[in-house]
């Protein structure tokens, strides 16, 4: 058991469990958290154990879930509450180690190396203590995987649920994991599993037994990585809680309550998405130089385009103008050619203080992107002052206090930044 001691703590049925904190009576009935069918996102995003036993699965539509479990209770998601519970969970973990790395809202890695000796507890006792504290102080359960690397710790928390501790060490990992289907190997996607099956690899043990070169020939770099993980060769560190992961892009998307049939409706949706993106970039001290947009039709046909700007930006109006130009250039929105959903992204990020050699006006920028009808433009310096002032007002009064070119449209399901959808 020499070396590192890594925990992976995973909230069980997290969204559903959070809802049951305020409504403990829901624990005794089949319950699922699901989107609003009116917004065309009526799918199950989490379910409790009773719904799970009835066969309800995450991503089931509401109709499918009700077919499997006629008496199921559906509740809408409350993401602010889930974030609050997540912070409380991590606060408990941070009492035992500075190395707490949230992997998502409901799971975190902990580097507990040295903790057993310090606290006078075995690894299992420490994991059980964390489970007990989360259960008693917050009101939800977690499963904890304990291992010498992050990959096996994660597989440990998946191994036995709910409210369980699983230890996977060098002495027992082959016995525990190698008989499992290769599809249960962390990061083994469906296509990779199918490729490995064609080469006679159906268990994790068979994956580990093949040569590293074989896996690279089969699957490229991802195959080599899977081979390393299957053999317990994962030395990726656990970050400190304060160390933020590198942000590579910021994007927002939305499926609208009904199809968008004109450019004014598209502009309304784009404005709200871009407002959130620009606020996130500014709060993170980042700018981006590549703007992308993805449109999806009711037929689920998808169209994506992007453009590289002559300089990085986090200005809402600039991002919106370029996004609208991309849409105008590539999609004639109408009742015959409607839009079901839009996703806007900004990537190739850099620090906000990074200098660039040329400041073009928005008019020049539009000219470089295309020649279709342009939105009203404002000089970059003036627009920067406007958006900086808006950011300060939002900080004081709330995100929904001021909007920039955005408005609510209940018919298509759009709410301004900061207002609950």
PLM region descriptions:
Residues 148-151, 232, 287-298, 339-350, ...:
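A glycine-rich phosphate-binding loop feature that marks nucleotide/adenosyl-phosphate handling sites
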Residues 12-14, 37-40, 298-301, 349-352:
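Short, charged/polar surface micro-motifs in flexible loops or helix N-caps
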Residues 112-114, 254, 308, 366:
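Short, histidine-centered active-site or binding-site loop motifs used for metal coordination
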Residues 184, 192-338, 356:
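DNA-contacting surface of Y-family translesion DNA polymerases
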Residues 41, 118, 152, 301, ...:
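Residue-level signal for secondary-structure boundary sites
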Residues 1-228, 238-241, 279, 369-421:
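Gly/Gly-Pro- and Ser/Thr-rich, intrinsically disordered tail segments characteristic of DNA damage-repair
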Residues 313-314, 318-325, 329-392:
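C-terminal hydrophobic structural anchor segments
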């Amino acid at each position: 058991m020499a070396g590192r001691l890594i925990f992976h703590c995973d909230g069980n049925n997290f969204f559903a469990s959070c809802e049951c904190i305020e409504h403990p009576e829901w624990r005794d009935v089949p319950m699922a958290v699901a989107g609003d069918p009116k917004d065309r996102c009526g799918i199950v995003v989490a379910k409790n154990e009773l719904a799970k036993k009835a066969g309800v699965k995450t991503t089931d539509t509401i109709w499918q879930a009700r077919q499997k479990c006629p008496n199921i209770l559906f509740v809408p998601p409350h993401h602010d509450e889930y974030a609050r519970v997540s912070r409380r969970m991590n606060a408990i973990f941070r009492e035992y180690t500075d190395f707490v790395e949230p992997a998502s809202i409901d799971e975190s890695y902990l580097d507990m190396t040295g903790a057993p000796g310090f606290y006078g507890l075995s690894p299992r006792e420490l994991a059980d203590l964390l489970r007990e504290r989360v259960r008693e102080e917050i009101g939800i359960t977690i499963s904890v995987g304990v291992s010498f690397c992050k990959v096996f710790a994660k597989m440990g928390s998946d191994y036995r649920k709910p409210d369980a501790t699983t230890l996977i060490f060098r002495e027992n990992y082959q016995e525990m994991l190698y008989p499992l289907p290769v599809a249960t190997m962390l990061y083994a996607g469906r296509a990779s599993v199918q490729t490995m099956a064609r080469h006679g690899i159906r268990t994790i043990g068979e994956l580990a037994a093949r040569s590293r070169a074989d896996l690279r020939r089969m699957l490229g770099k991802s195959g080599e990585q899977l081979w390393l993980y299957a053999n317990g060769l994962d030395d990726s560190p656990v970050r400190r809680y304060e160390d933020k992961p590198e942000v590579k892009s910021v994007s927002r998307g939305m499926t609208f309550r009904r199809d968008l049939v004109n450019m004014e409706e598209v502009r309304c949706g784009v404005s709200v998405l871009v407002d959130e993106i620009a606020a996130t970039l500014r709060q993170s001290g980042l700018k981006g130089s590549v703007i992308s947009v993805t449109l999806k039709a009711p037929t689920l046909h998808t169209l994506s385009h992007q453009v590289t700007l002559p300089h990085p930006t986090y200005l809402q109006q600039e991002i919106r103008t370029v996004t609208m130009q991309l849409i105008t250039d590539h999609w004639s929105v109408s009742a015959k050619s409607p839009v079901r959903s839009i996703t806007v992204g900004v990537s190739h990020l850099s620090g906000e203080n990074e200098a660039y050699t040329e400041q073009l006006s928005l008019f020049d920028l539009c000219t470089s992107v295309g020649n279709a009808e342009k939105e009203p433009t404002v000089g970059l310096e003036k627009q920067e002052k406007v958006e900086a002032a808006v950011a300060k007002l939002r900080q004081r009064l709330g995100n929904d206090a001021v909007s920039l070119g955005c408005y609510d449209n209940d018919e298509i399901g759009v709410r301004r930044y900061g207002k609950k959808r």
